[in-house]
Amino acid sequence: MFVNRWLFSTNHKDIGTLYMIFGAWAGMVGTGLSILIRAELGQPGSLLGDDQIYNVVVTAHAFVMIFFMVMPIMIGGFGNWLVPLMIGAPDMAFPRMNNMSFWLLPPSFLLLLASSMVEAGAGTGWTVYPPLAGNLAHAGASVDLTIFSLHLAGVSSILGAINFITTIINMKPPAITQYQTPLFVWSVMITAVLLLLSLPVLAAGITMLLTDRNLNTTFFDPAGGGDPILYQHLFWFFGHPEVYILILPGFGMISHIVTYYSGKKEPFGYMGMVWAMMSIGFLGFIVWAHHMFTVGMDVDTRAYFTSATMIIAIPTGVKVFSWLATMNGGNIKWSPAMLWALGFIFLFTIGGLTGIVLSNSSLDIVLHDTYYVVAHFHYVLSMGAVFAIMGGFVHWFPLFTGYTLNDTWAKIHFTIMFVGVNLTFFPQHFLGLAGMPRRYSDYPDAYTTWNTISSMGSFISLTAVILMVFMIWEALASKRTVKSISLTSTNLEWIHGCPPPFHTFEEPAFIKSSH
């Protein structure tokens, strides 16, 4: 029974729960790695050893957080749980493939951990650029294991993407039109398209790297007519859409949370929100070389990538102001989920503004590979993606479990986390402007103050993570059941109660629209 339910599961809710648990566990590992990084940088001098081990930790931190925490929770967890419920489908289109998508991740994670354990580890950064990732600078199996790990995670995501696209296009009941599809469903659909188009390019790039390392090909080796810059183009053609993949489902969740706790029946500018997400998805594919302003591109090429990158700020701004407009005139309920959503809007916007700064190719020459970039992408990921996950988690926790979290603890948790992440990452802007480079385990004494403050912030965030574990335990132990849910007419996922039965929408739903 246990094996049939959890190992051979074909139920979207159970698979979503597995993704959630796996993502939470990986998040603990990633948090531990980030604490190691900040402990090393907390004061000048060496803590862990040389830069190789430091860069192994940094690389593992990036891969764990991206491929094993944010993506499994947002797309695998929330996506699996909510998409079928929101569109009134009985399950995903391919339930067994759904299960395989999940079970490819633990072996992938195992390979990544193995890569750190053998030889000297993969100290390449998450970009895995040759020649540093080649078989001279990184002899041994570490980078090869990392490549195989990425292959498995990539296959998992591609299969998941096919599943979501098929489900969303084909499994809506006739009563739901395209324009009644909830924004979270739209966001997952667009995310799935991005995954489907970008991951094969990454697979090609890392496969060529694998053959360069092991079969003496010279795709990225000038000695045989190859070019390491080709790898950078292939990687970033995946890598830039990837960062939008990480944030788009968050946009969808924030839209639902802001609408719900503003007491509105729909978000402001529904069509504009859909257009904005589609625009971001499209533009995300044509800006990749802004990660490569320092490799010596022509001035006209740099001008194009600068302006194209700045254009993305327009649909993003549409979303931010639509969220604010959704709240306007509403009866706002200051629930923990709403606090996360407001924190998201504020901090994501700050991250977006530093992104606009970095999009200027001339400025980026100076800021590239400094802590300014680290601060920028942690504002959009550590305070964008993670805040969206937290907001979604506390909002839908009653749906997933049938129990309610303690509101007071949840608000305290938000406050600690908010202080922690800002104290960690805001000073890094100053470090970057002062020229402190990334990916070094030590630094000149002049940078000590901001690094010490940053490291203190990371320990505050750690406290918040531990408190969240306590909060979940408290909720599951107290067993406060959900009494009633408001606004179910526009929030279809709640209509079956909390938690919903194992099978939902076994016959096609008819959704009566009031307008």
Swiss-Prot record:
<dbReference type="GO" id="GO:0020037">
    <property type="term" value="F:heme binding"/>
</dbReference>
<feature type="transmembrane region" description="Helical; Name=V">
    <location>
        <begin position="183"/>
        <end position="212"/>
    </location>
</feature>
<keyword id="KW-0999">Mitochondrion inner membrane</keyword>
<feature type="binding site">
    <location>
        <position position="291"/>
    </location>
    <ligand>
        <name>Cu cation</name>
    </ligand>
</feature>
<dbReference type="InterPro" id="IPR036927">
    <property type="entry name" value="Cyt_c_oxase-like_su1_sf"/>
</dbReference>
<keyword id="KW-0249">Electron transport</keyword>
<dbReference type="InterPro" id="IPR023616">
    <property type="entry name" value="Cyt_c_oxase-like_su1_dom"/>
</dbReference>
<feature type="transmembrane region" description="Helical; Name=VIII">
    <location>
        <begin position="299"/>
        <end position="327"/>
    </location>
</feature>
<feature type="topological domain" description="Mitochondrial matrix">
    <location>
        <begin position="1"/>
        <end position="11"/>
    </location>
</feature>
<feature type="transmembrane region" description="Helical; Name=VI">
    <location>
        <begin position="228"/>
        <end position="261"/>
    </location>
</feature>
<feature type="cross-link" description="1'-histidyl-3'-tyrosine (His-Tyr)">
    <location>
        <begin position="240"/>
        <end position="244"/>
    </location>
</feature>
<feature type="transmembrane region" description="Helical; Name=VII">
    <location>
        <begin position="270"/>
        <end position="286"/>
    </location>
</feature>
<dbReference type="GO" id="GO:0046872">
    <property type="term" value="F:metal ion binding"/>
</dbReference>
<feature type="binding site">
    <location>
        <position position="240"/>
    </location>
    <ligand>
        <name>Cu cation</name>
    </ligand>
</feature>
<keyword id="KW-0349">Heme</keyword>
<dbReference type="GO" id="GO:0005743">
    <property type="term" value="C:mitochondrial inner membrane"/>
</dbReference>
<feature type="binding site">
    <location>
        <position position="441"/>
    </location>
    <ligand>
        <name>Na(+)</name>
    </ligand>
</feature>
<comment type="function">
    <text>Component of the cytochrome c oxidase, the last enzyme in the mitochondrial electron transport chain which drives oxidative phosphorylation. The respiratory chain contains 3 multisubunit complexes succinate dehydrogenase (complex II, CII), ubiquinol-cytochrome c oxidoreductase (cytochrome b-c1 complex, complex III, CIII) and cytochrome c oxidase (complex IV, CIV), that cooperate to transfer electrons derived from NADH and succinate to molecular oxygen, creating an electrochemical gradient over the inner membrane that drives transmembrane transport and the ATP synthase.</text>
</comment>
<comment type="pathway">
    <text>Energy metabolism; oxidative phosphorylation.</text>
</comment>
<feature type="transmembrane region" description="Helical; Name=IX">
    <location>
        <begin position="336"/>
        <end position="357"/>
    </location>
</feature>
<feature type="topological domain" description="Mitochondrial intermembrane">
    <location>
        <begin position="213"/>
        <end position="227"/>
    </location>
</feature>
<feature type="transmembrane region" description="Helical; Name=X">
    <location>
        <begin position="371"/>
        <end position="400"/>
    </location>
</feature>
<feature type="binding site" description="axial binding residue">
    <location>
        <position position="376"/>
    </location>
    <ligand>
        <name>heme a3</name>
    </ligand>
</feature>
<feature type="topological domain" description="Mitochondrial intermembrane">
    <location>
        <begin position="118"/>
        <end position="140"/>
    </location>
</feature>
<feature type="topological domain" description="Mitochondrial matrix">
    <location>
        <begin position="328"/>
        <end position="335"/>
    </location>
</feature>
<dbReference type="Pfam" id="PF00115">
    <property type="entry name" value="COX1"/>
</dbReference>
<protein>
    <recommendedName>
        <fullName>Cytochrome c oxidase subunit 1</fullName>
        <ecNumber>7.1.1.9</ecNumber>
    </recommendedName>
</protein>
<feature type="topological domain" description="Mitochondrial matrix">
    <location>
        <begin position="171"/>
        <end position="182"/>
    </location>
</feature>
<dbReference type="InterPro" id="IPR023615">
    <property type="entry name" value="Cyt_c_Oxase_su1_BS"/>
</dbReference>
<feature type="topological domain" description="Mitochondrial matrix">
    <location>
        <begin position="401"/>
        <end position="406"/>
    </location>
</feature>
<keyword id="KW-0679">Respiratory chain</keyword>
<keyword id="KW-0472">Membrane</keyword>
<feature type="topological domain" description="Mitochondrial matrix">
    <location>
        <begin position="479"/>
        <end position="515"/>
    </location>
</feature>
<feature type="topological domain" description="Mitochondrial matrix">
    <location>
        <begin position="87"/>
        <end position="94"/>
    </location>
</feature>
<feature type="transmembrane region" description="Helical; Name=IV">
    <location>
        <begin position="141"/>
        <end position="170"/>
    </location>
</feature>
<feature type="topological domain" description="Mitochondrial matrix">
    <location>
        <begin position="262"/>
        <end position="269"/>
    </location>
</feature>
<keyword id="KW-1133">Transmembrane helix</keyword>
<feature type="topological domain" description="Mitochondrial intermembrane">
    <location>
        <begin position="41"/>
        <end position="50"/>
    </location>
</feature>
<feature type="transmembrane region" description="Helical; Name=I">
    <location>
        <begin position="12"/>
        <end position="40"/>
    </location>
</feature>
<dbReference type="GO" id="GO:0015990">
    <property type="term" value="P:electron transport coupled proton transport"/>
</dbReference>
<feature type="binding site">
    <location>
        <position position="368"/>
    </location>
    <ligand>
        <name>Mg(2+)</name>
    </ligand>
</feature>
<feature type="transmembrane region" description="Helical; Name=II">
    <location>
        <begin position="51"/>
        <end position="86"/>
    </location>
</feature>
